[in-house]
Curated annotation (Swiss-Prot):
The species this protein was found in: Bacillus pumilus (strain SAFR-032)
G5: annotated segments: 352-354
Domain tr-type G: 207-376
Family: Belongs to the TRAFAC class translation factor GTPase superfamily. Classic translation factor GTPase family. IF-2 subfamily.
Residues engaged in binding GTP: 216-223, 262-266, 316-319
Protein name: Translation initiation factor IF-2
Origin organism lineage: Bacteria, Bacillati, Bacillota, Bacilli, Bacillales
Keywords for this protein: Cytoplasm, GTP-binding, Initiation factor, Nucleotide-binding, Protein biosynthesis
Sequence segments annotated as region (G2): 241-245
Amino acid sequence: MAKVRVYEYAKAIDVSSKDIIAALKDMNVEVNNHMATLEDDTVKKLDAIYKKAKAKETANEKPAEQKKQSSNKINDRKKNDVQNNQFNKNKKNNNQNKNKNKRGGNNKSQHQQARPVKPKKELPEKIEFTNSMTVGQLAEELGKETAEIIKKLMMLGVMATINQELDKDTVELIASEYGVPVEEVIILEETELEKYEVEDKEEDMQVRPPVVTIMGHVDHGKTTLLDSIRKTKVVEGEAGGITQHIGAYQIEENGKKITFLDTPGHAAFTTMRARGAEVTDTTILVVAADDGVMPQTVEAINHAKAAEVPIIVAVNKIDKPTANPDRVMQELTEHGLVPEAWGGETIFVPLSAKTGEGIDELIEMILLVSEVGELKANPNRAAKGTVIEAELDKGRGSVATLLVQTGTLHVGDPIVVGNTFGRVRAMVNDIGRRVKTAGPSTPVEITGLNDVPNAGDQFLVFKDEKTARQVGEARASKQLDEQRSDKAKLSLDDLFEQIKQGEVKDINLIVKADVQGSAEALTAALQKIEVEGVKVKIIHTGVGAITESDIILASASNAIVIGFNVRPDGNAKSTAETENVDIRLHRIIYKVIDEIEAAMKGMLDPEYEEKVIGQVEVRQTFKVSKIGTIAGGYVTEGTITRDSGIRLIRDGVVIFEGEVDVLKRFKDDVKEVSQGYECGITIKKYNDIREGDVMESFVMQEIERK
């Protein structure tokens, strides 16, 4: 007979898992959690207990009612006795307190009369201060002479005057000499969102959907698993099979919703993955059964453990002939994830994202873990949550993907998001439909902000737009002041370091990406590169096309510009050529890291180099059946050839990269079209061409090894 798990038995007899665990403890049967298995003897004992309980319930309904009434009377009498006793006690205490107060009052008046004598002041129970404290203030708080405090400071090697400010550590040291504890009181500024927070009452809390993060190594099948769950295709078209942006999606199973955060799997996305773990309730760790534990798998485990989030291991690709789930279990045991089959507490679900096997069991486990976790939020309050992703859209302006964590977000709500503010103009859910409200654990994309926030920023809804504007502007102003002071410090520190160390090899980089999350992740990854004698210094990061100002900054700082999924505009290109600034353009994150790392080690030895040979401005489009979309364009630069690669750029962002299918001049097929002439172009297997797009023609040229 197959062994039954605690939760399965509970489900079968319609009792909660917690009740079963409690009953087992009374029987002296030790179980760790709801996933523990039950022996046949234990099941029989439980059956006997619950059958007896049901029989008693039906037989003793009337006596129970009578008992209840009599017990209520007894309880009422007991309550009255307790209240009378309490009243008498309170009377006594009040009289004692009055006498004490009188005595205290007499002492107080005696102290006031004896003030000229200046008796020794008693040490306080504790000292409270904000930010810092002067020597004079500390002496007054301790009831000591200023000279005595200055003497103590001199013994510690600190030369100070009466009005000199002391930091927290020094205040603590001096206070500890007198045995007085110190507490720093943090006063929330107008710019702190916590100041406008409202505490939720327990009775207002309601069950909310779980937020699940899918983590794991690159190419282990995270996005395919999510795709299998959602039953829609989101993998196709992603460069190198790596998810480039964090997406948030919601599914519904048996009337219960689950929100998924899809964090990219490559080690470069450390910051994005860490940010995902901050808002998540459960982590699904995807490990390929044919590949085992990899560096990014270990990294994902550490993030989930640091966030104290329960981990469910999804052993993927079990349909492959080389799959070995036992090896995965063995390797994960070394990292503290022991399967419940081996006496541990970690849930392991073998599955195949490709065939769909094991998906239902995984969803059941997610709902079970969330049920045990008792996830709750108050939906009837001003919304609060976190930014998952943000970008600047030419048509819609600032667009931010938000995850509502508590409260309900409405269209028209005044909102502060990080250092930006605005009013929620429109809300779109994960399937692209416009919605008017979004409750707890719901991901939505909003427009209406005055600027692009940073991924990971907190947001809060305010009562009126005026307050939201004031707080948003104050936060932006504060950030600007901090940046200015940091920059001033940095330049001075760098100058000192160079004088002190002599020659320091620095690689200055400017990072531009299509979305904030990619820029953040790329910056973090590049700063992690460690090569002896060489330092990486990110002097600027931004979102959007590479502009002329980026090139001027690079020229002044002797920096290399890295574009991820973005292109330089016309002015930037010409300025880069004039100023001799190196621009590196990439679509795959790890290629950027490999290239920079190789350059730092002095091992970069490219064999081929991309050369842009021409540019076409799309002025009109024609849709023809069996052919697709034909772009009518004007060659603004260089030459377009039929055998060259073609890149479609929209608003400075690369939309597609492929090959020229047909190149025509009037009705004739031609091999090339030069600058100043019109032409017709079709792109192989791609039809989404629009007026105003730019096509860039390029070839790969072999260059000499140096």
